[in-house]
Amino acid sequence: MTMSLEVFEKLESKVQQAIDTITLLQMEIEELKEKNNTLVQEVQSAQHGREELERENSQLKEQQQGWQDRLQALLGRMEEV
């Protein structure tokens, strides 16, 4: 009888350890999910910022090309004079 009680207590202890481990792992999973969500938001924000910068860069290149064209036209007129 004492032997089976000891075995039961060891089993109970192991079950409790398993429950504790599972609980800790669940908490860690939740933390990792939150971190992942934060990182996803940061990536989306960075992508949005990049898209804005690419649009602005494109506009600036167009403006630069326009100014270069005007300058070439002015230089062409000056050479004619």
Curated annotation (Swiss-Prot):
Main subcellular localisation: cytoplasm
Oligomer status and interactors: Homodimer. The ends of the coiled-coil dimer bind to each other, forming polymers. Interacts with FtsZ.
Protein name (record): Cell division protein ZapB
Cell compartments where the protein resides: Cytoplasm
Residues forming coiled coils: 5-81
Family as reported in the entry's similarity comment: Belongs to the ZapB family.
Originating gene: zapB
UniProt function note: Non-essential, abundant cell division factor that is required for proper Z-ring formation. It is recruited early to the divisome by direct interaction with FtsZ, stimulating Z-ring assembly and thereby promoting cell division earlier in the cell cycle. Its recruitment to the Z-ring requires functional FtsA or ZipA.
Record Pfam families: ZapB
GO biological processes: division septum assembly; FtsZ-dependent cytokinesis; vesicle-mediated transport
GO cellular component, one term: cytoplasm
UniProt keyword terms in alphabetical order: Cell cycle, Cell division, Coiled coil, Cytoplasm, Septation
Domain of life from the UniProt record: Bacteria
Record flagged with keyword Cytoplasm: yes
Compositionally biased spans, kind Basic and acidic residues: 48-59
Region: Disordered, residue numbers: 43-65
